[in-house]
Amino acid sequence: MSYRAFGSYAVALFIVAHLFAGCTTKVDYTLGEEYIPTNQNMELKRRVYRAGVMREGDREESISMASTKLYQSDSIKSSNLENVYFGYEKSPIYGDRKAGFMTQVLFGSKLDDDYGWGYRPIFDSMTLSLYITDYHGDTTAKQRYGVYEIRSNDYITNSSDSIFYINFDPTNYIAKDPIFEFTFPNQERGSYVGDIENPRYCNVTLESTYYTQEYVNRLMFTTNLAETDDYGLDTAQIYKQGNEKEFVKYVRGLYIAPIGEPEGGENNDGEKGAMFATNVENSAMVLYARSRYKEDPTIIKDTVIMSYNFYVSPTTYKVKAGNVSISRVEHTFIPEDQTSIDGNNVLISKVDGMGGVVTELKFTDEFIQSLADVVLSRKDASVSVNQAHLNIYLEGSDYDYSMINPGSITHILDKSMSRMGLYARYGGTQEGSKSDIIAIADYLYTKEANMSIPYNGYLNRSLALYQMNISNFVQSLMMAAAANTNEEGKVQFEKFEPGGELARTRTIYIAPAADALFGFNRQRVIGGDVEIDGLTNSAPITLEIVYTIVN
């Protein structure tokens, strides 16, 4: 830099300094300091409840986290679902489960105004058109079924509830004896299950019984042909679009259920039989009839085909009669499970995807106290649960995945549900209210979502477990525990007992995913870490909590 330039620069600095010479500026560094916590301390901690021990850092404490029981609710909605279910399975582990379905029907086409079914029509045959979308068990094992006529619609007209459940009993509304019978599957007669990845229609020929002809006569208006000049005429025009309400009063529908036990032998697990799901809107009963020439009744004129479609959505098809379909599921549990339902704690629990038993997980007093102690460990502390992972292990699994036997666990994994849900209420619990199914806060379920939900709940095949993020649930339980303590910091457990205001905060129901409450898969899961008759589980349910504490 030249001296001349340096001189100009110095002059400039002098001028700026002179301009501010008369100004004084005082900075107040205390502004807002009342909002800054004094002596603030923030720590991130991790604790694990595993096999009856709580570990946090170098600290270990014997704490049993949870117990498990078997629980069953019949209050699972089974009306107007996408599928209806039928079949019979027997298992030495899970007991028997049997399903049938009840459905109203609607005509598939309009009858001719002038000729109806034709002149002196003849009943030829009746088929059942199924659209199998899922199955479970031995699909080669034959099962006999009965088709019963619904004789009364009182179950709809006299009911204040438009929802029906798996325990619905159709006995008072159906005929005592079947109007048809059939065997399914029936390979000799061409009735196969098919490929569920590419479903197709499967037509089953129905076999007549003593009551078939009387039923068909009413469908075809042939009970008294003399009144209609020997034509099977629809004089009331119930087969006419717009008169669906009158139709379902006259043709009330069907109930299809297994007769007897499944045929065939047992598989390697000692199980026999099968269960099926058929898409209800793609299923129907189809009547084939023939009409004659009036001029020469010995000659067949036409073939008349009428389909009686199962449940048709009034929203989708804008029909004026909202008809109903209901699946009924019956369970006969093995004696061990029957005595354990709502009873004693179990080491190995179960989850059945078809209205069977599920697992009730109840957190222990000492676990709840340990959560309260976290909040009370520091004066005026604030605790935030960053993450809480609940791990539920399949039977045959282990904490050390290298110890899992691949040969045995693969079979178990293949039969397990792809996802499980956690619920604060599952059906008719303490109040006995039906279909009272409420997920825990973390389980935001939907069939389609544009976001990834942290709950997870999917089967981890590598570790043979289900992992659920229950951070909100644990946070709520922790706050409830800390807010309900006495002067000594002991939790007031009476509030968490049945009938108490906080009773529901300590219990979770492990059950099928919310969008798959009806499914055929079922499995045994390792239960809690509470000792039962001197025995404990090898890999009980674990909980890992990461939390931040600030004071």
Annotate each predicted stretch with a short phrase:
Residues 2-9, 13-551:
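Secreted, disulfide-rich extracellular signaling modules
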